[in-house]
Amino acid sequence: MNAPTVIAPVRKSVRVKAPLAHAFDVFTSGLTRWWPLDHGVGKKPIQKVLMEPRLGGRWLEIAEDGTQTSVATIILWEPPHRLMMVWQINAQWKPDLTMKSEVDVRFTADGPNATLVELLHHKFETMGAEPGISMRNDVDRGWPGLIEHYAQEAERSSA
């Protein structure tokens, strides 16, 4: 009998020069301001990317023709400290409600005007060994640039 595949999580963090509540708000309500509109899985061109700010809310891409594509579902909503999403994208970067890797984002005040943002993307095993490893490698390369876009927008809009 084969041992279950264990796939290492992806961990990324950034210190944002912005107060805690603002840092959380930019990550969630301000998604269109920092997420690259050419970086999507649904119909193109993308007009906006948004997060429904509640438990059970969705991360959505909205195309210029109004087509909505769900990327993730929020399974934990604790503003301004934490949110967790089930990432519903397959290894071919297509929406797939059967995929269930998770993105856990924590926000911790680091003084009155700074926030430590820690992102954990894990549970790639739920995708199967080969697709899970492929997704893990892709997001390990992708999240650093995305988190940098986010940090720049949070700091710019906090000034």
Region spans (language model):
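Hydrophobic ligand-binding cavity/cleft-lining segments
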Residues: 1-46
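A structural signal for short, well-ordered beta-strand segments
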Residues: 12-16, 119-121, 143
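Conserved strand-loop elements at the edges of beta-sheets that form or border functional pockets
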Residues: 16-18, 53, 76
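Hydrophobic pocket/interface hotspot
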Residues: 23-27, 59, 74, 85, ...
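Solvent-exposed alpha-helix faces
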Residues: 28-32, 79, 148
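Short beta-edge strand/loop motif at the mouth of beta-sheet-based domains
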Residues: 30-71
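Hydrophobic-ligand binding "helix-grip"
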Residues: 49-50, 64-114, 122
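A conserved amphipathic terminal alpha-helix motif
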Residues: 123-159
